[in-house]
A protein has these predicted regions:
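Secretory pathway targeting signatures of secreted, lumenal, and periplasmic proteins
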Residues: 50-105
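C-terminal motif of bacterial Sec signal peptides marking the signal peptidase cleavage site
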Residues: 24-28
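Extracytoplasmic/secreted envelope proteins and their assembly/folding machinery
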Residues: 101-108, 157, 184-191
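Short, ordered beta-strand-loop transition motifs
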Residues: 37, 45, 64-70, 124-133
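Short, low-complexity, disordered segments immediately C-terminal to signal peptides
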Residues: 29-47
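Signature of long, low-cysteine stretches enriched in small and polar/charged residues
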Residues: 105-162
Length: 197
């Protein structure tokens, strides 16, 4: 009887181990993981990356016919006819770029004169393991007041995340907003929402 009881315990333990292994395999252990998109956020999807945007805060996707040719995807926050926030994805925006550092240098050059860099750091993104290395640049700038942007002199906050996808295509993902409209936690969530393919 003891043997039967022990055997039953081993069978139960074996079933639990098999179930755990099955769940691990289904969850993609060692494979592609995805960024964490917070509740109340939407997602912009492109062939190289996907990124979250704060939909509940008023951001909405811009139709392809309305966005600039350099942008693969855009979400805008428009208030009283002014673009007070933007999330954009640019792909293949520079030539001769082979890694995250080079992508960040090219993307950083596009931040513009008069911008103040606040921080630059290496980050690890979710997604294809070969393409997870990226660089984050935090900066501030002053709105020009042109092209439906906030009044001239308005301080703006920005973050750009740059890297190279698994097919060696450089990407730059930006979020800009009127300073104070997005918290540091929101900006961290933006970076954490990225999945690179």
């Amino acid at each position: 009887m003891t043997l039967t009881s022990t055997s039953t315990k081993f069978r139960a333990l074996g079933a639990a181990v098999v179930a755990t292994l099955g769940l691990t395999l289904l969850s993609g252990c060692g494979g592609e993981d995805a960024g964490t998109v917070p509740d109340g956020w939407g997602t912009l999807d492109t062939k190289s990356v996907s990124v979250g945007y704060p939909e509940a805060a008023g951001y909405a996707p811009q139709p392809a016919a309305e966005r600039g040719k350099a942008n693969a995807a855009v979400a805008l926050k428009v208030e009283k006819g002014l673009r007070t926030g933007m999330v954009s994805v640019q792909l293949n925006f520079a030539t001769g770029v082979g890694d995250a550092g080079e992508a960040a240098a090219a993307a950083g050059a596009g931040i513009g004169l008069g911008a103040t860099r606040k921080d630059t750091q290496d980050v690890r993104l979710a997604g294809e393991e070969s393409a997870q290395e990226a660089r984050r640049i935090d900066y501030e700038f002053t709105s020009s007041g042109e092209e439906s942007t906030p009044a001239k002199g308005t301080r703006m906050t920005g973050v750009v995340v740059a890297g190279v996808d698994s097919k060696d295509v450089p990407f730059a993902i930006r979020i800009n907003a009127v300073k104070g409209e997005l918290s540091p936690a929101d900006l961290d969530s933006f970076v954490g929402s990225v999945t690179v393919r």
